[in-house]
Regions:
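Extended amphipathic alpha-helical segments with heptad-repeat/coiled-coil character used for oligomerization
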Residues: 375-376, 546-550
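Serine residues within intrinsically disordered or low-complexity segments
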Residues: 12, 20-21, 228
Length: 558
């Protein structure tokens, strides 16, 4: 019997419609209803017409952010917003997002090209109708900017992995951004309504390119609710009438650093299989705004056949290889995922391997729950350690293709009847997880059994494992639980430290245990923590004190 899939979207509420407008594209009419939160609900006969309306709505809501996202992807931010963006612009030019997206645009399916073009027509119509809202620095936009933006979003994950390889080679890379999220799936066998429950809970910034745009789309067979990136027409997180899609950061290793041996007589040659090869050199001009003027800097970017040179040390050059470097298929894959009618169709879409490294979780109306540790993973040569720079002077260390999805860590309908991923290894997703590192290639699993164990994950496992016949309200309570797991351990440690510290007299002749180790204010903060109920309720002073204490130990500890 077909089951109805219950989706708990933590960032979405269905509410009465409050306003509407109409948009027309290619002789098709679309209607945009806005609920009381301003979220657009788009109704259209065709996906192209819906795309036009979504473009109009995005521009109406956050035009400047949308245009900034395209500038970020194309590496043109610093010419408008100054030198703080120069380094990022250089990285995007290095990877040629705009150029590759333009050159390979016709490889995108005709359906998605039509949608991207209609989407941008909607943006342009709003700009034409409301010139007073168009920033002076607004650039001309092109359909392939959507493709370039997808590449830009993907790149954050493999760049971070490769940065770790550089660091282990003794080179300090640019710091990688920390990204975290929660997700969980509960199988029909453990729910009160005999249907799967999915929770999608991304923890990304309210600022910048990862500030999501929420939308609901009804266009023929396309019926999707979720969030997208500004400048992209369709959601990648959310649900259709058939499947839900959630993601959290984590996954296989999809990038490498190659150590290149340079010719002492010609620094733009590198040794490969006993011969000197010429590097490819590309010139770029990047503008940097200084006051009212723009300083145009001409730079030269060097490439080996592995990828761009990103560092030099001790006469060696270090090139970066990313498995997505020539890929432009993300838009098509996301569309296939959001139109999949069952798990088999979803797996076929995921097998395109266009998504960045993510813990992907899928629920279906048929009652299936599925996990994939997703990524476009290069097949490394035997004996190569991809966690540090790889010798680049021999064909023996070359990538040997891309692992098919069947090689990746995945599970369908686990025996626990639930699973979650809060940025943990697959072993930490459920009690007695069968997804152990010993079963997989190390760089595919890319974690240990205890990797990134933390209170979010342990709390989720314990709460899910203790429940049965879960109701919708119970699932929401689990997702929103204000309990701070294991805070009692910190309270006990603080009490022990204070208890063994000699008493001294404080102002007014009042003795405080351990006050010689704390200022008066510090002692008061410790008292707040020790007397706290270990809940992060909005009004909790103890929770704030605990957070400040943890942040004082290390920026990422809290």
């Amino acid at each position: 019997m077909k089951r109805a899939l219950l989706i708990v979207i933590l960032f979405s509420l269905v509410v009465p419609f409050a306003a509407s407008s109409r948009a027309t594209a290619a002789n098709d009419e679309a209607t945009i209803y806005r609920d009381e939160y301003g979220i657009p609900h788009v109704y259209a006969q065709t996906l192209e017409a819906a795309s036009f309306a979504i473009g109009y709505a995005q521009a109406e809501d956050r035009l400047e952010e949308l245009l900034k996202n395209y500038r970020k992807a194309n590496g043109t931010m610093s010419e408008v917003f100054g030198p703080d963006y120069y380094r990022s612009d250089l990285i995007q030019r290095m990877w040629r997002h705009s150029e590759i997206s333009r050159e390979k645009y016709n490889e995108v399916s005709p359906k998605m090209r039509a949608c991207m073009e209609a989407f941008q027509d909607g943006i342009k119509l709003f700009m034409k109708e409301h010139p007073e809202q168009v920033p002076k620095w607004a650039q001309e936009i092109h359909p392939w900017d959507v493709v370039a933006l997808g590449r830009y979003i993907i790149w954050g994950w493999p760049l971070g992995e490769a940065g770790g390889d550089l660091q282990r080679g003794g080179i300090q890379p640019d710091p990688a951004a920390y990204r975290g999220s929660n997700e969980m799936l509960i199988a029909p066998s453990r729910t009160a309504m005999n249907a799967a429950i999915a929770v999608i809970d991304p923890h990304l910034s309210w600022y910048g390119e990862f500030r999501f745009y929420q939308v609901r789309i009804y266009a023929g067979d396309y019926n999707v609710s979720g969030v997208s990136i500004l400048g992209v027409p369709f959601p990648s997180l959310g649900h259709s009438r058939y499947c839900s899609v959630a993601m959290t950061t984590g996954g296989p290793d999809t990038s490498d650093i190659f150590e290149e041996e340079l010719n002492p007589a010609n620094a733009r040659q590198y040794r490969y299989d006993g011969q000197w090869r010429d590097m490819t050199v590309r010139k770029e001009k990047i503008g940097v705004k200084k006051g009212d003027a723009v300083d145009w800097r001409e730079i030269e970017i060097e490439y080996t056949h592995h990828g761009p040179i990103v560092a030099h040390k001790d006469g060696k050059a270090y090139s970066m290889a990313i498995s997505y470097s020539k890929e432009i298929g993300l838009t098509d894959q996301v569309h296939e995922m959001m139109t999949a009618k069952n798990l088999d169709e979803m797996k076929r879409a995921l097998a395109r391997l266009q998504l960045m490294s993510q813990n992907v979780m899928v629920g279906t109306v048929q009652g299936d729950i599925y996990y994939l540790r997703n990524g476009r993973v290069p097949i490394r040569a035997k004996g190569v350690d991809p966690n540090k720079p790889i010798p680049g002077n021999t064909s023996a260390t070359e990538w040997q293709g891309i692992h098919p999805m069947s090689d990746l860590v995945q599970i369908t309908n686990p025996p626990t009847g639930y699973m979650h991923n809060c940025n943990v290894s697959p072993f930490g997703m459920m009690k007695d997880s069968p997804l152990v590192p010993e079963k997989y290639v190390s760089y595919i699993y890319n974690a240990t059994r205890t990797a990134t164990r933390h209170q979010r994950a342990e709390m989720m496992t314990d709460l899910l494992d203790a429940t049965n016949k879960v109701t919708l309200d119970q699932a929401i309570d689990i997702a929103f639980s204000p309990q701070v797991y294991h805070a009692e351990l910190w309270q006990a440690r603080l009490s022990k430290v204070i208890a063994i510290t000699p008493e001294v007299t404080v102002t007014g002749g009042v003795a405080r245990p351990g006050s010689n180790s704390f200022s008066t204010d510090g002692g008061a903060v410790m008292d707040l923590i020790r007397g706290w109920n270990r809940r992060s309720d909005a009004e909790s002073v103890g929770a704030l004190a605990f957070y400040a204490f943890k942040k004082s130990l290390a920026p990422d500890v809290a």
